[in-house]
Amino acid sequence: TKANSMTTGRIYKSVIDKERRGDYLGKTIQVVPHITDEIKRNIKLLGQKYHYDFVITEIGGTIGDIESAPFLEAIRQMKWELGKRAINLHLTYVPYLKAAGELKTKPTQHSVKELQSVGIQPDVLVLRTEKHLDDDIRKKVAAFCNVDFDCVVQSEDLPSIYDVPINMLNQGLDEAILRKCGEQIGDKPALGPWREFLDRQRKATKEVHIGLVGKYDLQDAYKSIREGLLQAGVYNDHK
């Protein structure tokens, strides 16, 4: 729905419209508090409207981008206001240098330091990587980034994006999040239908080639169509 997506343009338009109506009583419009308050209002709106237990909000871009500064400030304020009811999960990249045959954690360390410099301490780190990370690397990242060891999980390259939730479950990401939120940890979910889908995907034997004519070169522009076709194919023994 409309409440599930938030753009910078929509945030600024909403603030400008409020200023034109006189909602701010003639005050000078500032990034803090007016823009940040509007960002927080939009984030909270989804949970208040539909009474969700959890609301997941993604802040796109890269730490340090000037465009994301108001959003990061809003997130910092929300953590301060909500305490344990909000956690910050940071997705970061651990590159593999093929020539040297080693994984480098410096980009992750610097990324976290950038976050800390604006007042945000990640509660959980998800390390995006091409190669498997051993415990020594995870311990190093945990120590340098002030994050609990069991809250440093890896997201390595997998055959299918649908394998990722199983990988996260096996590493205990769900339990780490529940602990950080002070929630009770129940039985481990079986994810039967999800595993059945993955099994069907691996065992699909027939191939079908579908041409999609579109306006844009970027594949993600048609992500929902591509994934819809993929899922329909899996349930009909096609890949």
Where are the regions a protein language model picked out?
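Flexible phosphate-sensing "switch/lid" loops adjacent to ATP/NTP-binding sites
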Residues: 1-238
